[in-house]
């Protein structure tokens, strides 16, 4: 009983909110960025204090009107006004409590981290040993190796863990004060948005109009009848299209033995918008056996081989032509070389004869009688041959 009396006294002291306060709270409710979470088993919306202050400083109440001062001039004035809203129970302060993981999961994560760090250290030791061997053989690359080691030392040894959002829950805060910062405040004030109000009003009017259909004029009833028939035909045509596309797919699939998958309007029954359900017009996929693919690959490889052989034959022809031109050039050089050799041979023979003649002149005194007789006999034989040659043409003339 005492607590209820205290609560009533607080309400009386605070009083009911004014129109201006309701307008500010409504603006803040629909324009300040909010998030939803669970609190005490209920789904609630919450906002952050600093974002609420920024939102109100950008509002129309932060601009001075003619003959009136601006309601919000500084961040402190916004904080004071939000304290008033908090006291009038538009929202209340909450405490963000992070959910702790069980001990088993933490132990497993630590063990995994240790195992990964041990493997990385082993890999690093192997890499360092290989680097030391290379540095001994190649002294010039020591500077590059030191730079790479410095870069590796700068990077952390363990791999970066994936950033995961930590789960938390909200609990009511003991100190109900509005503070500018990252403090969390849960909304209590939940007014009806104008859009939801308008949609509900239109729905109610439509239901009332449908119930009063017999009282409509004849022209309106005929028009509504044709509209309903058109809508029914449209829905029926979509259903028929869905069935027809399945039948077409089955026919093509059976004829081709399951190799061709053809879909007409593939997104017709998909969870997409009205326009996207008619895009694309069709899709086609080939899912044939591997043998056909191998045959195609073989045919392509044969074509490539033929093309390569033709290129090789062309290159060989070019090489033969180049070889012929080189042979003709070499033959010309060899002919000139042969003439030179013949000239040198004739010169050598003349030199030998001159030497022989000079030798005979020098060794004249040393010739024996037998050699003189042989020379005289040879001279006689030569004279006889000359006479025979002279006598032969005379006989021929006679």
Swiss-Prot record:
Q: Which residues lie on this side of the membrane: Cytoplasmic?
A: 1-196, 256-398
Q: What does this protein do?
A: Required for preprotein translocation.
Q: Map out region (Disordered) in residue numbers.
A: 101-167, 289-398
* Transmembrane regions: 197-217, 235-255
Q: How does it sit in the membrane?
A: Multi-pass membrane protein
Positions with biased composition (Acidic residues): 373-389
Q: List the record's Gene Ontology CC terms alphabetically.
A: endoplasmic reticulum; endoplasmic reticulum membrane; membrane
Q: Does the keyword Transmembrane apply?
A: yes
What species was this sequence derived from?
Gallus gallus (Chicken)
Q: Which InterPro entries match?
A: Sec62
The name of this protein is Translocation protein SEC62
Q: Which family does it belong to?
A: Belongs to the SEC62 family.
Q: Name one GO biological process term.
A: post-translational protein targeting to membrane, translocation
Q: How does it assemble?
A: Part of a complex that contains SEC61, SEC62 and SEC63.
């Amino acid at each position: 009983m005492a607590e209820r009396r205290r609560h009533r006294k607080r309400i009386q002291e605070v009083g009911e909110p004014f129109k201006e306060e309701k307008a500010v709270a409504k603006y803040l409710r629909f324009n300040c960025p909010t998030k939803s979470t669970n609190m005490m088993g209920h789904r609630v919306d919450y906002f952050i204090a600093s974002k609420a202050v920024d939102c109100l400083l950008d509002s129309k109440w932060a601009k001075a009107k003619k003959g009136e001062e601006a309601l919000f001039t500084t961040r402190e004035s916004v904080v004071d006004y939000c304290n008033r809203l908090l006291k009038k129970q538009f929202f209340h302060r909450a405490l963000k409590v992070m959910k702790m993981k069980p001990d088993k999961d933490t132990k497993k994560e630590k063990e995994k981290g240790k195992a990964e760090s041990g493997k990385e250290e082993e890999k690093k030791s192997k890499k360092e040993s290989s680097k030391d061997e290379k540095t001994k053989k190649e002294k010039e690359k020591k500077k590059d190796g030191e730079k790479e080691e410095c870069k590796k030392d700068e990077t952390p040894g363990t791999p970066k863990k994936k950033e995961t959002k930590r789960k938390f829950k909200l609990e009511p805060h003991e100190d109900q004060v509005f503070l500018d910062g990252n403090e969390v405040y849960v909304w209590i004030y939940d007014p009806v948005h104008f859009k939801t109000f308008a949609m509900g009003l239109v729905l109610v009017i439509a239901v009332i109009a449908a119930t009063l259909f017999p009282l409509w004029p004849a022209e309106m009833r005929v028009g509504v009848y044709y509209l309903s028939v058109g809508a029914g035909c449209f829905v029926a045509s979509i259903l028929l299209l869905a069935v027809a596309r399945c039948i077409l797919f089955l026919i093509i699939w059976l004829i081709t033995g399951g190799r061709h998958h053809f879909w007409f309007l593939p997104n017709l029954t998909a969870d997409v918008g009205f326009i996207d359900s008619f895009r694309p017009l069709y899709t086609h996929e080939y899912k044939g056996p591997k043998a056909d693919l191998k045959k195609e690959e073989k045919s392509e490889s044969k074509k490539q081989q033929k093309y390569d052989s033709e290129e090789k034959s062309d290159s060989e022809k070019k090489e033969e032509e180049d070889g012929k031109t080189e042979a003709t050039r070499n033959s010309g050089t060899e002919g000139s070389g042969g003439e030179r050799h013949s000239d040198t041979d004739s010169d050598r023979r003349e030199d030998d004869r001159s030497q022989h003649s000079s030798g005979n002149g020098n060794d004249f005194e040393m010739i024996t009688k037998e050699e003189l007789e042989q020379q005289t006999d040879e001279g006689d034989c030569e004279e006889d041959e000359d006479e025979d040659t002279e006598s032969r043409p005379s006989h021929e003339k006679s």
